């Protein structure tokens, strides 16, 4: 990112430093690394949009998978266990790097449901969207998320709600309790949404074919007051199509 901002010369310097760091990392003994550091490396590769050459990413994911299995089966918590930020970061990193490690994703989906209250609204929405990017659909995890999120919607920002709804559509997961909770909650918060979040939410609900008269009526009224903003972003037609879909359900 620094290289892109500073220009081609700086970008070459950044790439050179990155190459040296990657070479040094390849010599690490993964068994001696802390669990949180493994997760941080995976997140870092994703943020850099970089998948290391060879099998380094796979080896890190394999090691982290085994650590999580050990932690899950242990009778007591350990200081080496992965916290909510570490779990979210690793999932985000894999999604940004386009690296789909089935074993690690599976154990994370088995681990997270029992710990959802440890996760912030930001972490929950990031996880959902990361799974959507990876096209990874774990039914039990999504059922748990759908049951949990409606109870915490007041903690979510407008963007986090929009991201979560859009992720559920990308995953083609129509969870009635989740969708009902969102639509019950949204009318009073519509002014908080920017036009992109508003359009994405309406589009996703329409694609999921979820009928909720109160929300649709509130959205129709609200859109009339946001025509100028929608027109500025050239999104009037998109919103009207989504509204038409919701009204026809």
Predicted regions and their residues:
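Eukaryotic RNA-binding helical-repeat scaffolds
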Residues: 1-249
